[in-house]
Amino acid sequence: MKQRFIRQFTNLMSTSRPKVVANKYFTSNTAKDVWSLTNEAAAKAANNSKNQGRELINLGQGFFSYSPPQFAIKEAQKALDIPMVNQYSPTRGRPSLINSLIKLYSPIYNTELKAENVTVTTGANEGILSCLMGLLNAGDEVIVFEPFFDQYIPNIELCGGKVVYVPINPPKELDQRNTRGEEWTIDFEQFEKAITSKTKAVIINTPHNPIGKVFTREELTTLGNICVKHNVVIISDEVYEHLYFTDSFTRIATLSPEIGQLTLTVGSAGKSFAATGWRIGWVLSLNAELLSYAAKAHTRICFASPSPLQEACANSINDALKIGYFEKMRQEYINKFKIFTSIFDELGLPYTAPEGTYFVLVDFSKVKIPEDYPYPEEILNKGKDFRISHWLINELGVVAIPPTEFYIKEHEKAAENLLRFAVCKDDAYLENAVERLKLLKDYL
């Protein structure tokens, strides 16, 4: 009797619920993302016969091959030795970091910022997620310009929002000549038509990943005025703010009081100090009430950000301002691009000359890959650029990112011949990459 009861109870328990109760967002989308596919391909390629004995050169994901500046490392080491700095910080950020950010940005915004204008976050991505979570109700729409940083999409959708895509139109003859970021343009009439009664926000990224475009004052003014007209919040992703190679860098929040009141600006210590693993970012706004919603969401997402690294960033910002570090970094990156793009000039492969960021898009239309080249099934189901990337990893030992991942399926043809390379590497590493890419001559 007892055994029969146990058997019946067990059967009841095993059939009343599924084995795993998971969020449908993650169970319905089982396809591997570009980062997983590229990293797995690189790991396998490292062991193939052609790459044995030579280093795989990874210019794919935007992580640095070198350490943060010595002054930042010293500040992190000092912070770890202070007992209370290893405990929770205030949810909106350590006062020391907030004060350093006020010191950094007040001259830029031409006003004396206050603590209520700043929220520290656990990286810029969490800052964007906090902005969206603080703003969106189910069904609200967010306009995203295409191509986009892929993390924007799940951030919006996990907050119950709907993504509306507006293209950044590529220049003509992209496959025939070198172009500039300024030649990639937004049709602002199309942008305004995309706004509906459900539109809550727009995300603008400048300098832009992956294009390398720095939006002009005129473009941002047009965008900002349309947002003011329709009361649309602007989330300005400015994580590459110190990496612009144009004469100036325009921040949309500074263009008018009305635009500033609708803008949330996101920044990153990881990008500023070659320390992407530190996971320290921030959100700024001249509208303290608007920012407060992002701050409340941040509190619920992670409560507080890493205290020792906040302290390190606070002091590193002060150090950087004293020694002109950010300008020096800009000049270093101008040289890095000069080193790296020289091979494409030599080979005659067109690219979009970056106006900012540490990325460059290169057109591989002229590269002749054997038609019978073997690809894994998961690559065959992707865009042409995934096949080019897979071939480049396996044959030349160079890793790049296929940028159709930054487009929706219907529009990915615009990038099917492109690859994105990251130059956030030391100069010797880039020189090795150039030597390796010279092997492309055999395929032109």
UniProtKB/Swiss-Prot annotation:
Q: Residue positions of the PTM N6-(pyridoxal phosphate)lysine?
A: K271
Keywords, A to Z, come to: Aminotransferase, Cytoplasm, Mitochondrion, Pyridoxal phosphate, Transferase
Q: Name one GO cellular component term.
A: cytoplasm
Q: What is its EC number?
A: 2.6.1.7
Read off the PROSITE patterns from this record: AA_TRANSFER_CLASS_1
Note the Pfam families from the entry. Answer: Aminotran_1_2
Q: PANTHER family in the record, alphabetically?
A: FI04487P (PTHR43807:SF20)
Keyword Oxidoreductase in record: no
Self-association and partners: Homodimer.
**Further remark, if any?**
Present with 1600 molecules/cell in log phase SD medium.
Q: What does this protein do?
A: Catalyzes the irreversible transamination of the L-tryptophan metabolite L-kynurenine to form kynurenic acid (KA).
Q: Which family does it belong to?
A: Belongs to the class-I pyridoxal-phosphate-dependent aminotransferase family.
Localization of this protein: Cytoplasm; Mitochondrion
Name the UniProt record assigns to this protein = Probable kynurenine--oxoglutarate transaminase BNA3
Which transformation does this protein catalyse, written as a reaction?
L-kynurenine + 2-oxoglutarate = kynurenate + L-glutamate + H2O
